[in-house]
């Protein structure tokens, strides 16, 4: 396990129409990389969202990233008030990242 790096995982679910704003916020906080999965569904405060529903154009978007502890602090400072205004969900957890030739942070 010595080739693993301790990091934080951030997982965010937001409405697709807010994705661009979210990405700008993450980049301003120093994020070097992220993954986006579009048209995700589930059950939340707004009821059930089915990504296969033809009437549901945009849907929700899932964004995940791994970063160091100091980056989490900067991301949370910008993200917390943003989520209160626009809604969404953010989970932060400890994780281990396999060491690779190019770690973006």
Put a short name on every predicted segment.
Residues 1-105:
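Positively charged, small/polar-rich N-terminal and surface patches that mediate targeting and assembly
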């Amino acid at each position: 396990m010595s080739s693993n790096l301790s990091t934080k995982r951030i997982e965010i679910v937001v409405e697709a129409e807010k994705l661009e704003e979210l990405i700008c916020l993450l980049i301003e906080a120093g994020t070097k990389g992220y993954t986006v999965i579009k048209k995700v569904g589930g059950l939340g405060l707004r009821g059930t969202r089915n990504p296969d529903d033809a009437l549901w154009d945009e849907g929700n978007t899932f964004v995940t990233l791994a970063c160091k502890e100091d980056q989490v602090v900067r991301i949370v400072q910008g993200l917390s008030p943003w989520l209160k205004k626009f809604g969404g969900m953010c989970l932060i957890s400890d994780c281990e990242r396999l060491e690779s030739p190019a770690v973006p942070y």
